[in-house]
Amino acid sequence: TASRSDLPPPGGGERTAGPPKLTNPQRVYWQDVDITKQGLADYYAEVWDWIAPHVVRRPLALLRCPNGVGSECFVQKHAHATFDRSRILSYDDDGEELIAIESVDGLVALVQAGVLEVHVWGTTLDHVDLCDRLVFDLDPGPDVTWAAVVEGAKEVRDRLADLKLESFIKTSGGKGLHIVVPHDGADWDTSKTFSKQIALAMTADSPQKYLAKMTKSARQGKIFVDYLRNGRGATAVAAYSPRARPGAPVSTPVAWSEVTAKLSPARWTVLNLQDRLKRLKADPWAEIGKVKQKLPGV
């Protein structure tokens, strides 16, 4: 296990010689669209410059599906004996071993281990006791229209803007949207409490539209404003990570101007995301690592 002082600086990339080797590269991970282990590794190589700022040196939680979508899957938050430890960092923070990567080879090593989804903490290895990105996950219940999800996302954005906080947005790769708030850092309790206050305010003002509890029985026709991603150890799917769902949808950063009723939440996939990235005139999240802002009261 690496100690804090043993870890190389971000983007060091000096730890390995040559790319990791894939065993059974033709193993199919998404049967419905014929995406193989090699295909997933190739995807990460192609989008590395886009995904790197959102995964490098951030503690990870991994959804492993060694036999592909539709087979048994499990979540892993700690390094495993089968992991390539030369490319997958393990980090001992007060006795807790975390998983992180620093290069595209690290991502490919995760592919080799059957990882189909990469989820991230809202922090980095440099300050694991401080949150530096909040996530509001808008998760629609049955019978909620996409237009209502879009409206909810814009309400989160506007409430944050009223507090002088800039936010960014991405598709979840499922049915919802994720609003992300970069900030200068606050302890986990402060971060979670702030995000909970936003969620509770929305449910108080529009109880017919929103709820802030996970209760499945109450979800019908409402959007769950999930603020629980903002506690220590909680995660949200990483920007540009695929989802272990039919079609291989990708959680895709978008500009706020793209967030309309016409936007399909699962529009971009492992197979077509590169086409979008080539057409973009600018990265919609270009400023996410440059924004300087503090949570209220911090």
Please tell me what each predicted stretch does.
Residues 148, 169-173, 190:
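Short, contiguous, pocket-lining structural segments
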Residues 63-65, 167-173, 213-217:
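Short beta-strand
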Residues 1-6, 10, 15-42, 49-52, ...:
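C-terminal accessory nucleic-acid interaction domains of nucleic acid-metabolism proteins
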Residues 46-157, 263-265, 272:
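Basic, nucleic-acid-interacting segments
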Residues 171-181:
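Short, conserved phosphate-binding/catalytic loop or strand-edge motifs used
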Residues 69-72, 82, 176-178, 232-234:
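Flexible loop/turn segments at secondary-structure boundaries
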Residues 157-171:
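Active-site palm subdomain of RNA-directed nucleic acid polymerases
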Residues 180-192:
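Catalytic palm subdomain of template-directed nucleic-acid polymerases
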